[in-house]
Amino acid sequence: MPKGNGKVIAQNKKASHDYFIEDTYEAGIVLHGTEIKSIRNGRVNIKDSHARIDRKGEVQLINLHIAEYEQGNRYNHDPTRSRKLLLHRKEIDKLIGLTQQQGYALVPLKIYLKNGFAKVLIGLGKGKKKYDKREDLKQKQMKRDVDRAIKDHMR
């Protein structure tokens, strides 16, 4: 199955607005039992999260909010703890070199279930400037106007 396919649980639409996504990587997430149950219920928020490579060479997903499981008891998890991502060593080494360049960041694009496992699609993004964002909004509006005109003309 190609990367990014599966039942999408959460999607980060703000990432394409704030970053030029140059490359994507599929990674597994190390989770506790109540976390995967909350993810299956769709109670996850990736809007303000990002990934970082620590000194040990491990990729951590920071500020990912997975709500506590309702039926969980005292063994429930911390909602915003950092979670380890599972990638191949070659991919991590490549990401270390790329993220040390100025303006690059690792951004989670979506969380999905693939063969029963929770996966995250992380993108290597270069931050957009304010004028880039405005230009994208103009192009989006022009495309919407053209599509609307074509639809009206077809009637």
From Swiss-Prot:
GO terms for biological process: trans-translation. Gene3D superfamilies: 2.40.280.10. CDD domains: SmpB. Keywords: Cytoplasm, RNA-binding. GO terms for molecular function: RNA binding. It comes from the Bacteria. Residues 132-155 are annotated as: Disordered. One of its GO terms (cellular component) is cytosol. Signal peptide: none annotated. It is found in: Cytoplasm. Belongs to the SmpB family. Required for rescue of stalled ribosomes mediated by trans-translation. Binds to transfer-messenger RNA (tmRNA), required for stable association of tmRNA with ribosomes. tmRNA and SmpB together mimic tRNA shape, replacing the anticodon stem-loop with SmpB. tmRNA is encoded by the ssrA gene; the 2 termini fold to resemble tRNA(Ala) and it encodes a 'tag peptide', a short internal open reading frame. During trans-translation Ala-aminoacylated tmRNA acts like a tRNA, entering the A-site of stalled ribosomes, displacing the stalled mRNA. This is SsrA-binding protein. It comes from Oceanobacillus iheyensis (strain DSM 14371 / CIP 107618 / JCM 11309 / KCTC 3954 / HTE831).
